[in-house]
Amino acid sequence: MEKARALEEQWPGARDAFHVPSYASLGLGDQTAAVRYLCGHSLGCMPRKTRGSVEAELSAWSARAVEAHVRHPGGTEWVNTDLPLVPQMARMVGASQQEVAVMGSLTANLNALLVAFYRPRGRRTKILLEKQVFPSDFHAFWNQAALHGLDPAATLVQVAPRAGEHTLRTEDIVAAIETHRAELALVCLPGVQYYTGQLLDMASIVAAARREPSIVVGFDLAHAVGNVQLQLHEWGADFACWCSYKYLNAGPGGIAGLFVHERHHGGTLPRLAGWWGTNAATRFEMRQTYDPLPDALGFRQSNPSVLDVAALRASLEVFEDFGGMERVRARSLALTGYLYELLTQSVFYRPEVGADGVGFTILTPANPAERGAQLSLLFWPHSDDPDKNTMPRVFADLRQNGVLGDERHPDVIRLTPCALYNTFMEVFESVQLLNAALERLAPESAV
């Protein structure tokens, strides 16, 4: 406990900038105290600035209606509502302003980018992805192959962890690229793997793929943006996309973003088109000609949701106020490092899966440079009877006692201390409560 206090003094966060759910608000009793919210990998907490930011746009709507598009009473006119966010978002992902657009939703943006960048020709048709890919991405890849008249099952090449391992090895990804070099049209992987929390070596993956100029490289950064430092331009990725409701704290279904490297600028790439991606000077002249913006903004299709932009604006201001991603990542390394330290000191922790009795291991890499904020815990023993299975019972116990992670069936709980709003004391208390939950189950496993 003393170490937690000392670490908090050394690494102060921005807790006061956020609303954190309480026991009472979650129906867990009448306590007004905040719970230990370790679920920012799924949905980030609401910044206190958000309500005012959104209400300002509601006020503009009520006061000026359509005229707020060009004559806003106190902020950015709606025709340009997303543009002030582009420089901030570019800093978040390590890109130039011309390489980033704030738009759409994650899978919609992924599909839009695949339309532009997945161009199968001759033998070069295959898409390299991971075996544990998030289902929405898998659906996008599968259907892109089908849209091109290809057999998706034969088109998708999936790289998996080795037998007995839980995370991908960079050398295995590189080897898969080399093996299929003559057939690959696209490599598309996560920046941070959603299930295990593994941070992939994106720089090495891009370098390996780009040894063959015909291979396009893209990333789904849903679990990376706002979590780890990114250098998309420097690494040379062709494209990337991300959401904003996890580590960016922009609210459920918040507006997303995409990156298109400057070498693809010029407006010549085929794409899903819409009027918001065309020349702003002539957009409202309703011409029946297509004059796309030359940079990432040319991938926009429709005008963005003003209320979603307002929520993202509030969140990005918190990041800026805190000092940017370098400081966020530094505090995150300390927080998750402390969580890892305490978990591995638990009497129920085992380095390997399958030990006797009740226990858990950590799927996430031990090396801090190979993970973000999230740690994924695998529990045992497993039972097909959900009332007897260890993980759901531990999860329910934790929630009842004010620790909120999330469950991934059948046996994994994900816990994420977020740098902006979680505290070292919360980490300490959460591990204490986890140990207590397992202690309550231990006598049963000994029967």
From Swiss-Prot:
Metabolic or biological pathway, per its Swiss-Prot or TrEMBL entry: Amino-acid degradation; L-kynurenine degradation; L-alanine and anthranilate from L-kynurenine: step 1/1; Cofactor biosynthesis; NAD(+) biosynthesis; quinolinate from L-kynurenine: step 2/3
GO MF annotation list: kynureninase activity; pyridoxal phosphate binding
Keywords, comma-separated and alphabetical: Cytoplasm, Hydrolase, Pyridine nucleotide biosynthesis, Pyridoxal phosphate
Catalyzed chemical reaction(s): L-kynurenine + H2O = anthranilate + L-alanine + H(+); 3-hydroxy-L-kynurenine + H2O = 3-hydroxyanthranilate + L-alanine + H(+)
InterPro entries: Kynureninase, PyrdxlP-dep_Trfase, PyrdxlP-dep_Trfase_major, PyrdxlP-dep_Trfase_small
Gene Ontology CC: one annotated term: cytoplasm
The protein, known as: Kynureninase
Species, as recorded: Eremothecium gossypii (strain ATCC 10895 / CBS 109.51 / FGSC 9923 / NRRL Y-1056) (Yeast)
Gene label: BNA5
